[in-house]
UniProtKB/Swiss-Prot annotation:
Pfam family membership, one: PRMT_C
Gene: Art4
Protein's recorded name: Histone-arginine methyltransferase CARMER
GO BP: any one term: regulation of DNA-templated transcription
Assembly, per entry: Homodimer.
Family membership: Belongs to the class I-like SAM-binding methyltransferase superfamily. Protein arginine N-methyltransferase family.
Record key words, sorted: Chromatin regulator, Cytoplasm, Methylation, Methyltransferase, Nucleus, S-adenosyl-L-methionine, Transcription, Transcription regulation, Transferase
Protein source organism: Drosophila yakuba (Fruit fly)
Function: Methylates (mono- and asymmetric dimethylation) the guanidino nitrogens of arginyl residues in proteins. May methylate histone H3 at 'Arg-17' and activate transcription via chromatin remodeling.
Record InterPro entries: Arg_MeTrfase, PH-like_dom_sf, PRMT_dom, SAM-dependent_MTases_sf
Ranges where the SAM-dependent MTase PRMT-type domain occurs: 141-450
Alphabetized SUPFAM superfamilies for the sequence: S-adenosyl-L-methionine-dependent methyltransferases
Length: 530
């Protein structure tokens, strides 16, 4: 076998060590079908030679076949997985069984055949299940990476002004932590955080992305002429190898209720590449939990379940499913936003230290609760939100999803109790929230609450993987009973005040319609009463 040229050797090394399932392509490949296995007779499957496009996928490598003459049209797409049958045939040919096709691929060079063989071997064997694969169902992983492989989903996150601008401010405001440093971007997506690191002066950024978004990130890197700074590596951080340790790890690993999607475990796993005294952006996360009262939300979910209480729905008795319907609706966490005045006590804060906590710490999270109730009412459940801090050498920056902060794409989350509890001001509400990780990249959330000194308690278990997205974009309404003055009188006082101003304006040439000046926005008082 002839020796490899430096460029081929570099490509092989990259495929084998930096990214075991890296993207690559092979031109001038002649593809034949095995027509008769006994006689080893072959027929050309496609007219002329083809190009094979290999791209990383969470389940293996996607192999796309296109014509050398027209690469815009995909002739066939295959998946090379761990159970794919394949064998070398001579120096330039490779036999592989894909779907129902038994193919022989004849490559343009010995080196191309070697590289393709290395790609297949890296998928097929010798790699024990990674930490990620052990904790994640294949179907969940496939859906997860497919979801984040869409540009529209990346756009949704990038257009979250609070999220994106806070990350940029945290990184650029601590340029001393990035100047001439080696940076690791975990779950890079479009690569936007990698670009921020380069803006702050990073010498090198390794952008790790397991979804097909990696190819788009590479396009952005090349079109912005920063390929000498940013290296996009397709793959999971649990599976890839880096050529060196890093000074800083950046990532956006937070999900609903901070922990959903279990990306935080991946973020903590990445510390194996962090130098001693290295930085993590963000540095820690605070999960806030508070009891809330919201009769409207509770009634909404309860009435949905009552659909199954009909005894004559088109002549069919549905009532046997009412109990299960009720259970299903109340197992759904509610994703929306609310006025913080519905909270009946100061929030309890649970801290996750990204620099020191271990991955195993996030498999079972037990949070003790103790609330001093500030207002009498009915507790319908618990509200959750989170803040994360970027602890830099120059400044600390916070990203908050609190109901008192500008709204983000994380919103807030509320977990209802099927049996609400009446509680009085001054009483103590105790209990526990238990987050139990599952292989669907989420958590089962168990809530237990008890009014101290009584026999009154309530509990529920919810499926964080299956939330109800309730947010409609409508303005958040103040809780009932929070007005301490007559809203009607407040409004008309405002009208009178603005009318007087407009009368004064008329004396200086202003116009008036029905006694109300043209400079007055009467909808403001209706939509935003003080």
């Amino acid at each position: 076998m002839s020796s490899l040229r430096p460029e081929e050797a570099r490509k092989l090394a990259t495929a084998a060590s930096v990214s075991p399932l890296s993207n690559c392509q092979f031109s001038g490949v002649v593809i034949s079908s095995i027509a008769d296995e006994q006689k080893l007779e072959f027929t050309n499957k496609y007219k002329g030679s083809c190009t094979l496009l290999c791209s990383y996928d969470s389940q293996g490598v996607v192999l796309r076949v296109v014509s050398d003459d027209d690469q815009s049209h995909v002739l066939k797409e295959y998946m090379i997985a761990a159970d794919t049958d394949a064998a070398q045939m001579g120096r330039r040919s490779y036999a592989v069984s894909l779907d129902a096709d038994n193919l022989v691929l004849r490559f343009a060079s010995d080196q191309d055949q070697q590289l393709f063989r290395k790609v297949v071997e890296n998928v097929k064997h010798l790699r024990p299940k990674s930490v990620f694969s052990q904790r994640t169902e294949e179907s969940s992983a496939s859906q997860y990476f497919q979801f984040y492989g869409y540009l529209s989903q990346q756009q949704n996150m990038m257009q979250d002004y609070v999220r994106t601008s806070t990350y940029q401010r945290a990184i650029l405001g601590n340029a001393v932590d990035f100047q001439d440093k080696i940076v690791l971007d975990v779950g890079a997506g479009s690569g936007i955080l990698s670009f921020f690191a380069v803006q702050a002066g990073a010498a090198k950024v390794y952008a790790i992305e397991a979804s097909n978004m990696a190819q788009y990130a590479q396009q952005l890197v090349e079109s912005n002429n920063v390929q000498h700074k940013i290296s996009v590596i397709p793959g999971k951080i649990e599976e890839i190898e880096l050529p060196e340790k890093v000074d800083v790890i950046i990532s956006e690993p937070m999900g609903y209720m901070l922990y959903n999607e279990r990306m935080l475990e991946t973020y903590l796993h990445a510390r194996k590449w962090l130098k001693p005294q290295g930085k993590m952006y963000p540095t820690h996360g605070d999960l806030h939990i508070a009891p809330f009262s919201d009769e409207s939300l509770y009634s909404e979910q309860y009435n949905k379940a009552n659909f199954w209480y009909q005894s004559a729905f088109h002549g069919v008795d549905l009532t046997t499913l009412h109990k299960e319907g009720m259970k299903e609706y109340f197992r759904q966490p509610i994703v929306d936003t609310f006025d913080i005045r519905i909270c009946m006590a100061k929030s309890v804060r649970h801290v996750c230290d990204f620099l020191n906590d271990k991955e195993d710490d996030l498999h079972l999270i037990s949070i003790p609760l103790e609330f001093q109730i500030l207002q009498t009412g009915i507790c319908h459940g618990l509200a959750f939100w989170f803040d994360v801090e970027f602890s830099g050498s120059s400044q600390n920056v916070w990203l908050s999803t609190s109901p008192t902060a500008p709204l983000t794409h994380w919103y807030q989350v509320r977990c209802l109790l099927p049996m609400p509890i009446f509680i009085k001001q001054g009483q103590t509400l105790t209990g526990r929230v238990l987050l139990e990780a599952n292989r669907r990249q989420s958590y089962d959330v168990t809530i237990d609450l008890h009014i101290e000194g009584t026999l009154i308690s309530s509990s529920n278990t919810l499926d964080l993987k299956n939330p109800y997205f309730r947010y409609t974009g409508a303005p958040v309404q103040a809780p009932p009973g929070t007005s301490t003055q007559s809203p009607s009188e407040q409004y008309w006082t405002q009208v009178d005040t603005q009318g007087s101003r407009n009368s004064s304006s008329m004396l200086n040439g202003g116009l008036s319609v029905n006694g109300i000046g043209d400079g007055m926005d009467i909808t403001h008082g209706l939509m935003h009463p003080h």
